């Protein structure tokens, strides 16, 4: 029955709903199942959300600091948590205002480890995000890679020192190669397809609350 309902919801919404949105719809219909089960069933059924392609926000400003090697090399799977993390920044625009989202995703299960929303793409957004992630780790870690693109934030010495102090190894995508960070790109695409493109937001505050509800759901 659950599989049938998933297929119905998926098709009724023109294949734009991912596992989070479908889980919410199931709950609205008094079908209690967690989002991890829905994601697993969608994978078994071969249901893939059709993401609308939009212009990608880029924080790349050239080589303003040290560029780390690509250690991840598109190996997006791991059988343990806190072994491979990915991060990136995306931009939303409502009227003439902008909002920036910076999350860290664990490749073990695709869950959001930590995130930060900011009206400006500044370095404090990145450090606040890291602080939230570090609180979920022991004082010192081993064998954890944090992968990003070559955005200016990730080239900063302060950022790199924060990772080193925690025992985290930095990895970066090759220049202008978004597929090297495909999991983060897909997360942004899914969020925008399920939430941002489907609803009309009158203000940045309204959008910010919706994103928090979406991620924390």
Give residue ranges: language-model regions.
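Active-site beta-loop-alpha junctions of metal-dependent nucleic acid enzymes
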Residues: 116-139
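Mobile genetic element proteins and their domesticated derivatives, centered on retroelements
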Residues: 6, 22, 38, 42, ...
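Conserved, non-catalytic sequence blocks in retroelement Pol enzymes and Pol-derived host proteins
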Residues: 12-15, 30-32, 76-78, 94-95, ...
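Basic, flexible linker segments flanking DNA-binding modules
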Residues: 1-80, 177
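RNase H-like polynucleotidyl transferase catalytic core
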Residues: 51-57, 146-150, 166-183, 199-203
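Charged alpha-helix within mobile-element recombinases
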Residues: 160-164, 177, 183-217
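An active-site-proximal beta-strand-loop segment
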Residues: 74, 78-113, 119-120
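Catalytic core of bacterial c-di-GMP phosphodiesterases, primarily the EAL and HD-GYP domains
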Residues: 141, 145
